[in-house]
Each structure stands twice: as structure tokens, then as C-alpha cells.
Amino acid sequence: MKRISVDIGGTFTDCFFVWDDRYVEAKALTTHHNLALGFNEALDLACKRADLDRVTVLSEVDSVRYATTLGTNALIEHKGPKVGAIVTHGFEDAIPLSRGRGYGEGLDYSMQQNLPAAERPDPIVPRAMIRSVKERINSAGKVVARLDPDDVRSVVRELVNAGAEALVVSLVNATENPEHELAIQEIFLDEFPPHELGAIPLLLGHQVSGRKGEYVRATSTIIDGFLHETMFHALSQLSQNLRDFGYDKPMLVIHNSGGMAQMNSTDALQTIHSGPIAGVGAAEHLSSETGVGHVISTDMGGTSFDIGLVPEGGVKHYDFLPTIDRWLVSVPMVHLDTLGAGGGSIASYDRIHNSIKIGP
């Protein structure tokens, strides 16, 4: 058995590979401008320890598995493109209002007990970047009000002219009938063809999440759109780098559900927490091998600290409506708690509020 596993975090890139009966690990600094460079450095160090070379390893290895917290860190630090959202007319404020729970979502229990002192998180999509189109599909999937193509063109142009670098579409009841979301996509591609310079991605809510619930589907699509380019470029760099050195198999990406898939079968949203969740899977295996009943899995990087549980020798806790950072989404994942503080966090004194702040 020959496998390579790589975990790229905000600070370090860790490489671990199994080569028949040998187990080798190595670490290098993450190179954010080109993630492949840090990966190559870690892999070369591991190869040196095993008396192998990179080309031999990549041409003979059975699989390369990739996990990361890059998406998690980008969301926590709000590093991403300017996103515009298109929703059904009359639902423009559904996202900012966040079902009336935005003040408490993602906070611990003690902080939720004092909601008057809580603050809403900074929006990924500000209200000024939300536009609506006149259309309506009922809960049975029947078209009640037809979509106006001219209205769509006007809205799309407004968002692009306002500086949108990614667009998301989340219409009411689109999971029952995606006709209008698909029509918006067709109009958008006609207005802004993907082969032209400056082309921007457009994501559809019913494709990102096929579950009911307008708000959680919208937030899921927004986060996916916010992270799409970041994760696409990161994964593409790594995939091309592997091919350049003789790896001719698909690169596998760890999902936050605990499974894995090829890059072209992975949404950006599915990569959030994939690094520490892969660690939870390893803790489950360790529990099984050693007979230890309960295991706590922790993953402290330079940017975040993640905690997972393996009670009674198995992963039993899944979130079907998890909160990622401060946002409720509808993508099922292994339960994990994340703190926005790690080995590289900086403490500072806020003179105005007379408080200590720690974080990225």
C-alpha cells in the first residue's frame, strides 16, 4: 500500500505517506501564493527521510489525499471575493434578518444567554449586494409567477457593475422546481460568457443544497460562492503540480462529512473543516485499534483550534444543520467545534472597550 496524505493549514503544510511497511511524516510552512511549493517542500523532506525521490513516489503511489482548513480560515478571517446574491422578490431581507437568530448563531451557551450584548457577524453579502427578481414557484413546484428575462439582465448588470466577483442565486422553492434558477444561469452566461476576461462564477442554490429551507440554502450557497475561487485555485495548483511530477490518478479531497471525492465532485463548502475532521476519523481508527472507549480529537493550527469527539469508539455526532463560524448551513458534516484562535494568534489590548482581543 502506497498513499500520500497532505493537510494544508493556514500556517503549516503536513505530509504523511505510507510506503509499504514504512510511515514517514514531514512539515513545511504553507506558501499561500502557491500552495504547491509548500507541499513540494514537505514531500521532498519526507522522501529524503525514506531514501526516495519525489518523481518515484508520485509515479508509483496509489492515491493522494488532500485535507485543509484553508476554507475555514478564509471564512473566519473574511478573506474572499465580493459576493452578490439574487433572491425572490420580497425575500431581500431574509438573509440579513437570519431568521431572527443572527445574534446568537455560532456563539456558546453562556454568550447566548446575554443576547442584548451580542453583535451580528459581519455579513458575507451586505444588504446593498442583494437583488431580487420577480418570480414565484409554490411549494408543489408549480410556477405561480413567470420570470422576466429583462428583469434578470438588469439585476445581473447591477450586481456586476457594483463590483460583484461571484454571484449566487437562491430562489424560493427552487428545490421543488429549479426552472427559474436555471433560466437565470442561462441569461447570465449569455450576458457574461465564461470565455471572456473577467468572467465570474455563478452558483445555484438548488445545486449546492437540495434540502428545503430558504435561509439555510441561501447561506450555504453564499459561503460556497465566497470560497469557490479560493478553493478552486488551491486545488488546481496542487493537482497540476502532481501531474507535472508523474502522478496520473485523481487527487482525492476529504469532505467534512468524513468521506472523500475527486476535485470535480467537490463543492467548496464541503472542504470546510476537512483537515480536523480527517483527524476525527483517525481518532476513531485509533480508538478501535487500542480499545480505548472515548477519544477527544484536537487540531491546533496557527489560525484555528478544532475539537472533535469519538464516544464509545465511533463517530456518532453529525450536524445536519451545522453552524460554520456564525452561519447556519444545510450541508451535513461530522460535529466539530472551532475556535478562531491558534498558535499564531495575537493578543492585543483594546483601549476603547477596555478589553483583550485575541485572534487573527
Annotate the PLM regions.
Residues 1-360:
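N-terminally biased helix-coil "hinge/interface" segments that flank
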